[in-house]
C-alpha cells in the first residue's frame, strides 16, 4: 500500500465561550468542516467510506454525533460514521485511525476530524433517576467533569500545569512572555490573512439575521497589556493564569484521507502525506509533558531528526505544554505555533487535535516548510503526535 495522503484540510473559526457559536450544535460545526474539506479535496461525497469525528462532550447531542455531522454535510447514508472520545486527542486520533483503516484496506476514503461546542455542554443531575429522597442536590458541569478534571483525583487540569511549572522552574514572567507572543502571532496571522486558506465560514442565525463567521474570536478579545496583571487561576501562590491557559471554545476541523495511488488515479494533487504517528502514555498527573515522549517516539518511527522538522504545532492547553519541549528538546520557539496557539486561539477539546493538523498543513505551505509535527497532551497522561510532509 502506498502512503496515505491528506487531500484536504479545513476548519471552522474558533468561537469564544458563549460567543459567536453559542447555540450552534456540535454536529453543525462538524458538518461545516466536513463539507468544506470534501469540497476542497475534489473527492465525491459518494466515495467516502467512513467518517470519524472526535467529540468529548457528547451529552445531550442525540445519538451518534458523527453520524449527524456526516449526514448534515451531505455524506451518503451508506457511509459509516464513528464518534471518538480520547479527550483532547480525539480529533487527532481519528486521523491516526483513518490512516490505519486505509493502510489495512478496510476503507478507501476517510473523512477524519473533531468537533466541540463547549458552550453548549449541559449540566447533569447524577442519581436523579433513582431519586434524591431528601435535601438539596447538585448539578454537575458536563464540560468540567468529563473534559477538564482529572478522573482519578478530581483536580483541575491547571493544577497539574503548576506541577510542570515547578519541575522546569518556569517563572511567571516566562509564561506571560510566551502567552503574549502567542497572541501577537495569532493577531498577526489574522491581519495578514494567514488563516484564510484553512477556515470555512459558518452561517449562524442571529436576531439581526444570518451572519457568517470566518474569524477566530478570541485573539480580538485579548488585551496583551493586562496579561502580566492577571491573578493565578489554579493555585493561590501559583503562576499559571487564564492567559497562559487555553480558553474554553467552540469549533471543528476535518481532513480527507486516501491512498497516494488512489489520489493519483483520481487526478488529485494532495496537500501532504502522513509519514507516521505515535502515542505516548505516562502518569495521569504528568499529561503536560507527554508530548515530549510522543515526539521522541515519532522521530524514531520516521527516522527524522529534530533539525529536519521545519514546523511544530504543539497544543497550548497551557503555555508550559509547549515550553517544556522547548526546554527539554531544544526546539526553537520560532518553529512552534508560528501563527499562535491555543493560548490565543482557544481549545475546543474534541476538535483541537484535528485543528493542529489543519493549521500545520497550512503553515508549512505559507512559510515555505516541508516537514512538520503536530502533537498535543491528553488528560489521563497521554499524548499523540503526527508527522506530515508536504507534497
Specify the residue positions occupied by each region the protein language model found.
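Active-site pocket-lining segment
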Residues: 160-162, 195-198, 205, 275-344
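Active-site-proximal alpha-helical scaffold in enzymes
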Residues: 86-116, 165-194, 254-261, 326, ...
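Conserved active-site "lid/cap" helical segment
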Residues: 1-61, 65-73, 80, 160-172, ...
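Flexible glycine-/small-residue-enriched beta->alpha junction loops
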Residues: 109-164
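Conserved catalytic cysteine-centered active-site region
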Residues: 55-110, 151-157, 221-247, 328-355, ...
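N-terminal extracellular/periplasmic Venus flytrap/periplasmic-binding protein-like
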Residues: 10-12, 23-24, 29-31, 40, ...
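Condensing-enzyme catalytic core mediating Claisen C-C bond formation in acyl metabolism
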Residues: 1-24, 139, 224-289, 293, ...
Amino acid at each position: 500500500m502506498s502512503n496515505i495522503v491528506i487531500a484536504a484540510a479545513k476548519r471552522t473559526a474558533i468561537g469564544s465561550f458563549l460567543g459567536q457559536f453559542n447555540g450552534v450544535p456540535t454536529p453543525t460545526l462538524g458538518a461545516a468542516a466536513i463539507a468544506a474539506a470534501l469540497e476542497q479535496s475534489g473527492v465525491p461525497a459518494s466515495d467516502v467510506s467512513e467518517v470519524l469525528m472526535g467529540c468529548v462532550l457528547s451529552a445531550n447531542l442525540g445519538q451518534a454525533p458523527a453520524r449527524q455531522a456526516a449526514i448534515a454535510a451531505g455524506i451518503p447514508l451508506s457511509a459509516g460514521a464513528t464518534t471518538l472520545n480520547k479527550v483532547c486527542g480525539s480529533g487527532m486520533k481519528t486521523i491516526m485511525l483513518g490512516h490505519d483503516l486505509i493502510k489495512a484496506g478496510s476503507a478507501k476514503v476517510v473523512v477524519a476530524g473533531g468537533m466541540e461546542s463547549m458552550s453548549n455542554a449541559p449540566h447533569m443531575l447524577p442519581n436523579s433517576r433513582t431519586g434524591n429522597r431528601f435535601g438539596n442536590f447538585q448539578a454537575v458541569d458536563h464540560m468540567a467533569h468529563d473534559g477538564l478534571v482529572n478522573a482519578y483525583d478530581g483536580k483541575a487540569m491547571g493544577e497539574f500545569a503548576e506541577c510542570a511549572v515547578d519541575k522546569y522552574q518556569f517563572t511567571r514572567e516566562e509564561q506571560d512572555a510566551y502567552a503574549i507572543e502567542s497572541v501577537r502571532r495569532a493577531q498577526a496571522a489574522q491581519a495578514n490573512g494567514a488563516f484564510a486558506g484553512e477556515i470555512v465560514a459558518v452561517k449562524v442565525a442571529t436576531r439581526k439575521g444570518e451572519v457568517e463567521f470566518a474569524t477566530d474570536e478570541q485573539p480580538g478579545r485579548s488585551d496583551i497589556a493586562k496579561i502580566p496583571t492577571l491573578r493565578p487561576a489554579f493555585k493561590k501562590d501559583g503562576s499559571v493564569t487564564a492567559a497562559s491557559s487555553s480558553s474554553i471554545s467552540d469549533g471543528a476541523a476535518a481532513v480527507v484521507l486516501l491512498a497516494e495511488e488512489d489520489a493519483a488515479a483520481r487526478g488529485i494533487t494532495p496537500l501532504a502525506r502522513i509519514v507516521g504517528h505515535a502515542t505516548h502514555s505516562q502518569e495521569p498527573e504528568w499529561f503536560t509533558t507527554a508530548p515530549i515522549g510522543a515526539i521522541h517516539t515519532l522521530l524514531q518511527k520516521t527516522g527524522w531528526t529534530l533539525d529536519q522538522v521545519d514546523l511544530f504545532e504543539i497544543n497550548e492547553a497551557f503555555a508550559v505544554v509547549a515550553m517544556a519541549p522547548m526546554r527539554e528538546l531544544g526546539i526553537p520557539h520560532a518553529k512552534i505555533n508560528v501563527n499562535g496557539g491555543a493560548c490565543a486561539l482557544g481549545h475546543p477539546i474534541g476538535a483541537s487535535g484535528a485543528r493542529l493538523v489543519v493549521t500545520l498543513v497550512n503553515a508549512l505551505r505559507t512559510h515555505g516548510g516541508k516537514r512538520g509535527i503536530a502533537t498535543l497532551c491528553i488528560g489521563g497522561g497521554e499524548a499523540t503526535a503526527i508527522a506530515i510532509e508536504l507534497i
